[in-house]
Amino acid sequence: MKVKSAAKKRFKLTKSGQIKRKHAYTSHLAPHKTTKQKRHLRKQGTVSASDFKRIGNLI
């Protein structure tokens, strides 16, 4: 089954079956954000349950 190239670049499937994603708001207009905010945004997030099926079909 073919996968969407855009989704392939943005999401990764973990061994436990969750989908990893990057946080938004990380690069543009970063100087006014606090250090704590930028540090938390650096970490990987997971796709929410409501979006899981839709994104799972793309990858």
UniProtKB/Swiss-Prot annotation:
GO terms for cellular component: cytosolic large ribosomal subunit. Belongs to the bacterial ribosomal protein bL35 family. It holds the Pfam family Ribosomal_L35p. InterPro entries: Ribosomal_bL35 (IPR001706), Ribosomal_bL35-like (IPR021137), Ribosomal_bL35_CS (IPR018265), Ribosomal_bL35_sf (IPR037229). It comes from the Bacteria. The keyword Ribosomal protein applies. Coiled coil: none annotated. This is Large ribosomal subunit protein bL35. Gene3D superfamilies: 4.10.410.60. Residues 30-43 have a biased composition (Basic residues). GO terms for molecular function: structural constituent of ribosome. Residues 1-22, 30-49 are annotated as: Disordered. Keywords: Ribonucleoprotein, Ribosomal protein. The keyword Ribosomal protein applies. GO terms for biological process: translation.
